């Protein structure tokens, strides 16, 4: 998308703790960048220091953009809107949409009010109907959406509309407390597995033990992540994703994910297989 538009993408390297360094952002972005995009939790599952990164982006005159690839984290972690980010966008498949061979997906996009009229698409807002009851309507929609459709900034297909409805129903059923409980469950199970790995003194260790994580963490050790996956598979454990082949400045290791779908028996099986290989 960016290459055809003549937009240059510069990648800032993470620090020794697996997080983006604000100074690296300043050096990479300089005063030429239009925006600084930050994923949190990042590829390694590490939660970024959002306030410092937003400040670093704004110092050079760039917009600060947070990308959330695991929306379940928002039940526990404050989003970029709480830390002076201009745009927050991401993937909301976790909100009640079952994965099927990778899809379907549901993207979300939010921004500061000062950028509202530059947003693509239409905004649905809350209002009241003629009886005074709660209702929803299109509160902002560019005329091109309805008149000059060839010049519209976006169009939504039926499938995406269905995904939005499904996620809305799921969130309404879960409620704020339910979403927080789910997020906390993911966090606590991940922390339990990390603690158990450190307790057994395995040669496979947590890559960044001091950095906060959500859902995922990186295991590094005497061999490659690909080798560890194969060895654990021989013990009937589907362990995770090797970082090799994904590009980026990541150590060669195994990315392990823990969610509310992983039972205590699943964690026990993982630990038993890892201890056997150690």
Which residues fall in each region the model found?
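Conserved PLP-enzyme active-site core in the AAT-like
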Residues: 1-135, 222, 226-232, 244-245, ...
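Residue-identity detector for threonine
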Residues: 2, 28, 69, 139-142, ...
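Glycine- and acidic
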Residues: 10, 34-39, 62, 149-152, ...
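Electropositive phosphate-/nucleotide-binding environments in soluble metabolic enzymes
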Residues: 15, 19, 23, 44-47, ...
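Active-site C-terminal subdomain of aminotransferase-like
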Residues: 95-200, 206-210
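Conserved C-terminal alpha-helix-loop-beta "cap" of PLP-dependent enzymes
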Residues: 177-271
């Amino acid at each position: 998308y960016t290459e055809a538009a003549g937009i240059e993408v510069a990648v800032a390297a993470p620090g020794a703790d697996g997080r983006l360094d604000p100074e690296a952002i300043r050096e990479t972005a300089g005063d030429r960048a239009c925006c600084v995009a930050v994923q949190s939790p990042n590829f390694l599952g590490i939660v970024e220091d959002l306030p410092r990164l937003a400040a670093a982006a704004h110092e050079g005159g760039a917009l600060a953009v947070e990308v959330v690839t695991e929306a379940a984290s928002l039940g526990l972690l404050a989003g970029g809107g709480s830390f002076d980010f201009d745009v927050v966008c991401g993937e909301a498949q976790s909100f009640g949409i079952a994965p099927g061979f990778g899809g379907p997906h549901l993207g979300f996009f939010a921004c500061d009010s000062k950028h509202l009229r530059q947003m693509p698409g239409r905004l649905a807002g809350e209002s009241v109907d003629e009886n005074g009851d709660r209702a929803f309507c299109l509160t902002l929609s560019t005329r091109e959406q309805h008149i000059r459709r060839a010049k519209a900034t976006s169009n939504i297909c039926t499938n995406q509309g269905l995904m939005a409805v499904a996620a809305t129903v799921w969130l309404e059923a879960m409620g704020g407390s339910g979403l927080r409980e789910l997020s906390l469950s993911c966090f606590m199970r991940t922390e339990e597995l990390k603690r158990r790995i450190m307790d057994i003194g395995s040669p496979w260790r947590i890559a960044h033990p001091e950095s906060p994580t959500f859902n995922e963490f990186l295991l590094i050790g005497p061999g490659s992540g690909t080798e560890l996956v194969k060895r654990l598979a021989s013990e009937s454990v589907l362990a995770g994703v090797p970082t090799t082949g994904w590009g980026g400045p990541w150590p060669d290791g195994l990315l392990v994910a823990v969610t509310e779908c992983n039972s205590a028996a699943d964690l026990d099986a993982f630990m038993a297989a890892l201890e056997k290989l150690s």
